């Protein structure tokens, strides 16, 4: 029998009260103010006119050295009262002579040019007269103030690194974690000023599979967070799997590092690297990269910027840092020596037999063990209870969970009829001037390359919409001869609408790779921009011959997957999307069916093409909207608006930069019909326009000037941040004004929007108020409700599990969860089921030791789950920031309505975001390339799970954030790579890193 879960627990801790206090003792070092002007003068010496000057001292390289050679030191973001901390009981990791030598070498590394040696000598002499002094300081680790208007905990800046580190040290003091097959021995990993919280990593564990052994560790991250309107801060614990790269290429004899990616290396020296420094119990860190050597004009693999040892030239190290080639050539030997060196695996390095993630029950047991380290001043965060606002947490029009075999044809016909009704309504919205006596016409295009996909495309459209007949009989020669303006046209007549499909073979070289230098040759941003521009122009000219109607249309395009092109840069997908949009068509891509080694897209061709039609038609506004089950608990006629900010920095890895706010408005029509009007905000016309028209309009924002491609992105973006914020809030003012007159619930994604709409930050928000411009915060307009959604990105929501009432394995129930405490809450949590592909992932799965099978034909046999992905649905926080309780609004009911918006009836799986936010976010596909950036490595990834494998997960319009998929949070993209090319020994100035507490540190 299925377990009925009443409660869930989160892997989080909080103080027992606002008065709880813990004071820790440290030795701390201030960054000497007397040094600032001299070092800045050195850094800005000879900078070209117009270049962004340094306003804060670039200590990044110095901090890199500390992570490698003095890992016990905690580095805080500057400016802060103190820069470096070490617990009082830890031996001095940087004795005076060592520190002085490091500073001298660091200054020389900042400006190594011979012409600046005299100036460098003067700066060294000036700094030597005011050496930094270690101070004994006390630091409050728990108690913190609250925000004036919102009553939200506002931790001090030092608490974000120091408090998690204190808890991590307490967990280490517990000793090893005992499990059925052995013990886990954890060590701490150093954290820099951009890292969040503390991290513990276990010893490497072997996993024999086939003819080789794969290696992995268990990792624990502890981070400090806040929750809106809660005066108590929270500590989140995230347990996961870290995999080690040991596969050596048969061609090079080394581990493969993808170009333009950095790999983290964890180090454990046998003796201290620095003479006179103590041996730390912590691991050390350094980073490798594969980069283009401009002098040699070839790709090379080495430590980033020469590695931390390069800054110490002239200092005799007690043990030399291993060479990059040594580790890359014999990675397993270095692991087997007690993790003397381990390369953190990333998905770009190829496959790995150990799969990421831990399942719910094992997480709960690891958390239970860690809770033994809790001091009296902390407690586990209380359990959450399921909502009682509705009998079911599903929408009223949710499809049945299971359908009998004999009833499947009837259910399929019902759903097809829903889609046809939605299509008729969406098309009528696109053509408001059409004759109302004439049936609306849905016209789409199938741009095919292979006969197999063309035939599947036709048959799946027929099945998807429940069409009758074949639409017309044509020969293969007619299909081959079809061209833009003279296509093969298939047509079906239905009671609701006419469906017309124009089939055209993709020709003119549009499906080929972009015209770029070959693999192994450097490709500049200007060359790529020019190639994209050319293909975009050709695509527009080609398809425009077939489009005469001004209304947006849909094109399903058959194209090779990215891996089939020479490099990812050669993939023409983004250029085709832009060009076809210029011609008036929104696009959905389907990969060419083929079998290539382990890759086989032939076996699921029908399913993939069906999903392509599904996703493409949704872009036209054809969808079934979830109908809430709350009756009069929410306002009648409630609309749903959502904002999404497309913002991307131009970096070495991302060649496009963009900033544009997007708003979507979903207006349900007849209650229970599932039909809704979907519109987007046009800031130029200051009005709402059909959603597909918005998508087409967004492509203009993807224009990249070839002349500016190499020099127009990064510096100007950072200088314009304040202007972008002003523009965002002015845009918000106009958009929000248009929502008056009808009850509307406005949704925003916290991690996405708060950097530009700062009111969404925990440190600024106040209940039932809003600020969207220069004016002071004001009460919400009577028609507006404001809800902020937050996901597991940056570990901002905790890991979780259901509390099994039978004291059996803890599972993963889906529902809306509310705090147990009395009173009216404002913050709720949403969970959804695992996708169908992972229903067999056992909740009691064990990655460390064999366990008995619980069910199936092999029940009772032992198995181990190290090679099984640990898929867990993410925990979504729903914070009702603003409503009108005095007028009858119930925050819990509003939150349940948002929870139900994650479950559209026409999607195969639940969404990670509510539907309106999902639609707003998908607009970024028309502004930026949609390729999910590869994870650098699992040391910089910050979420629970591994990236979705496209060969496992069905096609579908995934959630807009590449870190999220349907109902799941996957292994996260790392933080934006701010490491830029070095000019004269200096990295470019880096921007501030926003976070959720109302304060933005200067870097």
Regions flagged by a language model, labelled:
Residues 294, 299, 304-570:
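Long, charge-dense tracts
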Residues 2-289, 294-306, 314, 354, ...:
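Long, contiguous domain-sized segments
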């Amino acid at each position: 029998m299925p377990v009925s879960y009443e409660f869930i627990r989160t892997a989080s801790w909080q103080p027992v009260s606002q008065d709880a206090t813990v004071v820790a003792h440290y030795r701390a070092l201030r960054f000497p103010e007397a040094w600032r002007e001299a070092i800045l003068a050195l850094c800005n010496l000879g900078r070209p006119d117009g270049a962004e000057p340094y306003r804060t001292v670039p200590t990044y390289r110095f901090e890199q050295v500390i992570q490698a050679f003095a890992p016990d030191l905690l580095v805080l973001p500057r400016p802060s009262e103190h820069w470096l901390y070490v617990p009082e009981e830890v031996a001095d990791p940087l004795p005076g002579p060592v520190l002085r030598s490091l500073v001298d070498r660091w200054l020389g590394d900042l400006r190594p040019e011979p012409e600046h040696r005299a100036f460098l000598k003067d700066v060294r002499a000036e700094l030597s007269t005011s050496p930094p002094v270690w101070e004994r300081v006390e630091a409050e680790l728990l108690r913190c103030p609250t925000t004036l208007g919102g009553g939200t905990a506002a931790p001090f800046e030092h608490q974000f690194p120091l408090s998690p580190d204190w808890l991590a040290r307490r967990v280490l003091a517990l000793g090893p974690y005992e499990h059925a097959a052995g013990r886990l021995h954890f060590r701490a990993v150093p954290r820099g000023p951009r890292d969040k919280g503390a991290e513990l990593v276990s010893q490497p564990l072997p996993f024999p599979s086939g003819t080789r052994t794969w290696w992995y560790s268990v990792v624990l991250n502890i981070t400090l967070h806040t929750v809106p309107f809660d005066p108590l801060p929270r500590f989140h614990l995230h347990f996961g799997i870290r995999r080690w790269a040991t596969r050596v290429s048969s061609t090079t004899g080394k581990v493969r590092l993808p170009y333009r990616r950095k790999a983290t290396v964890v180090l454990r020296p046998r003796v201290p690297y620095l003479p006179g420094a103590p041996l730390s119990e912590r691991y050390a860190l350094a980073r490798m990269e594969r980069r283009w050597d401009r002098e040699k004009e070839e790709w090379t693999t080495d430590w980033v910027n020469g590695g931390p040892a390069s800054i110490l030239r002239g200092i005799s190290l007690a043990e030399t840092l291993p060479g990059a080639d040594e580790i890359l050539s014999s990675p397993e030997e270095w692991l087997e020596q007690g993790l003397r060196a381990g390369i953190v695996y990333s998905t770009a390095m190829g496959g790995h037999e150990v799969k990421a993630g831990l399942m719910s029950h094992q997480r709960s047991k690891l958390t239970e063990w860690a809770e033994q380290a809790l001091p009296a001043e902390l407690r586990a965060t209380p359990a959450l209870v399921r909502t009682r606002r509705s009998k079911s947490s599903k929408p009223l029009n949710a499809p049945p969970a299971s359908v009998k075999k004999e009833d499947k044809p009837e259910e399929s016909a019902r759903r097809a009829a829903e889609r046809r009704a939605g299509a008729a309504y969406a098309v009528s919205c696109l053509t408001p001037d059409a004759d109302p006596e004439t049936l609306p016409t849905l016209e789409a295009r199938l741009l095919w390359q292979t006969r197999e996909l063309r035939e599947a495309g036709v048959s799946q459209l027929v099945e998807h919409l429940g069409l009758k007949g074949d639409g017309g009989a044509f020969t293969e020669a007619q299909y081959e001869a079809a061209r833009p303006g003279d296509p093969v046209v298939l047509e079906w007549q239905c009671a609701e609408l006419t469906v017309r499909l124009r089939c055209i073979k993709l020709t003119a070289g549009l499906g080929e790779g972009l015209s770029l230098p070959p693999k192994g040759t450097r490709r500049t941003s200007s060359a790529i921009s020019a190639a994209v521009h050319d293909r975009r122009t050709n695509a527009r000219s080609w398809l425009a011959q077939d489009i005469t109607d001004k209304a947006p249309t849909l094109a399903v395009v058959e194209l090779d997957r990215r891996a089939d092109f020479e490099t990812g840069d050669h993939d023409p997908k983004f250029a085709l999307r832009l060009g076809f949009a210029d011609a008036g068509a929104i696009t959905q891509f389907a990969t060419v069916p083929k079998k290539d080694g382990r890759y086989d897209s032939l076996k699921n061709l029908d399913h993939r093409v069906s999903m392509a039609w599904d996703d493409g038609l949704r872009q036209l506004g054809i969808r079934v909207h979830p109908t809430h089950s709350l009756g009069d608990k929410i306002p009648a006629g409630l609309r749903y608006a959502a904002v999404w900010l497309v913002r991307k920095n131009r970096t070495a890895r991302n060649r496009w930069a963009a900033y544009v706010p997007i708003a979507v408005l979903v207006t349900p029509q007849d209650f229970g019909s599932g039909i809704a009007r979907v519109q987007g905000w046009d800031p130029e016309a200051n009005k709402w326009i059909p959603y597909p028209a918005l998508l087409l309009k967004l492509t203009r924002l993807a224009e990249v000037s070839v002349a500016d491609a190499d020099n127009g992105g990064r510096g100007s973006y950072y200088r314009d941040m304040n202007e972008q914020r002003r523009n965002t809030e002015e845009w918000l003012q106009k958009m929000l004004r248009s929502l008056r007159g009808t009850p509307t619930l406005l949704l925003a994604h916290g991690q996405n929007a708060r950097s530009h709409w700062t009111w969404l930050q925990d440190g600024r928000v106040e209940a039932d108020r809003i600020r969207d411009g220069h004016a002071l915060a004001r009460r919400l307009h009577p028609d507006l409700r404001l809800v902020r959604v937050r996901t597991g990105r940056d570990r901002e929501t905790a890991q979780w599990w259901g509390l099994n009432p039978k004291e059996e394995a803890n599972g993963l129930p889906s529902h809306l969860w509310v705090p147990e405490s009395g009173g009216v809450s404002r913050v709720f949590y949403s969970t959804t089921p695992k996708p169908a592909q992972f229903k067999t992932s056992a909740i009691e799965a064990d990655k460390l030791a064999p366990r008995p099978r619980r069910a199936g034909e092999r029940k009772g046999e032992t198995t181990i789950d190290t090679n099984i992905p640990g898929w867990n649905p993410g925990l979504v926080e729903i914070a009702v920031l603003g409503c009108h309780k005095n007028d009858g609004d119930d925050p819990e009911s509003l939150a349940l309505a948002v929870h139900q918006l994650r479950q559209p009836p026409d999607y195969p799986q639940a969404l990670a975001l509510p539907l309106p936010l999902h639609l707003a976010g998908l607009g970024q596909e028309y502004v930026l390339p949609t390729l999910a950036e590869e994870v650098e490595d699992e040391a910089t990834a910050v979420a629970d799970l591994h990236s979705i494998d496209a060969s496992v997960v069905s096609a579908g319009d995934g959630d807009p954030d590449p870190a999220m998929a349907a109902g799941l949070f996957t292994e996260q993209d790392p933080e934006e790579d701010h490491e830029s090319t070095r000019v004269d020994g200096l990295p470019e100035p880096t921007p501030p890193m926003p976070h959720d507490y109302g304060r933005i540190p200067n870097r």
